[in-house]
Amino acid sequence: MTIKHLVISGGGPIMIQILGAIQHLETNKIVDMKNIESIYGTSAGAIVGVLICLKFDWETINDYIIKRPWQDVFPIKVQNIFDAYTKKGIFDIKTIEKCFKPLLDAKDISMNVNLEDFYKLSNIELHLYSFEINEYKVHDISYLTHPKLSLMSAIQMTCGLPILVTPVCIDNKCYIDGGMACNYPLNYCIESGKQPDEILGFKNKYIDEKENVNSDSTILDFLLSFLFKAVFSVNTDHNQQQIKHEIICDSHYLSFDIFKKTLSNVEVRRDLFKNGIETAIKFIEQYLKIE
């Protein structure tokens, strides 16, 4: 069966593991990016989807993600924290633009490209998931639902982890990180009519205990801990349909310390990439048994 659709979980640094896994699968002819028709992603998973839609060679993407000094793009300064009071987040759309500008420039794509035009360039149906807090529900953000929305705003909407990234407020709606209620949008993919056997999913499995807040915790540790526990209180795993092709990515709970280490340490990013390859190797062993 040909894989035509990807469903990719959010989870911060997990995106580097998923990139490693996808590349190993394509190298071993389990999946061919030329056959991908649609991608469903939340938060970091949405970023992976955008990278795939840009259609760079893997070496270019790897160098960009692993070797770029990301601590310069996401500086943690006292002023940023003070500014967050009025901006509702430490990082805003300017940071999102810094992340993607070199890539879009290399493809001669405008920073203001909207979802409709981005679809015409990639010919891949990209669905990003965001949580709207006023109506308190998940929104599918794509060229079908928001054709004139800029790609940068769409990324901010799905990656707007409260406090860290400013929410997007438009049309009396306030959009934050889709992982708050839909970290793995598998059901949305299936319900849109996609054949389950043509879907490849990348799903998180957390392998460590959630860190408790204590007297040494920072305000960001406190907030991230609260957000993760809020997410798991509305865990939808038991409602998700089962698919034949699903890669389980072992992951650590996101803490501010892990966030900083991933941004600042090339070796940490390399290890995450290698972990993704190892995950893909295990999947291939099982895949060959059932195909």
Predicted region positions:
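Patatin-like phospholipase
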Residues: 1-42, 47-291
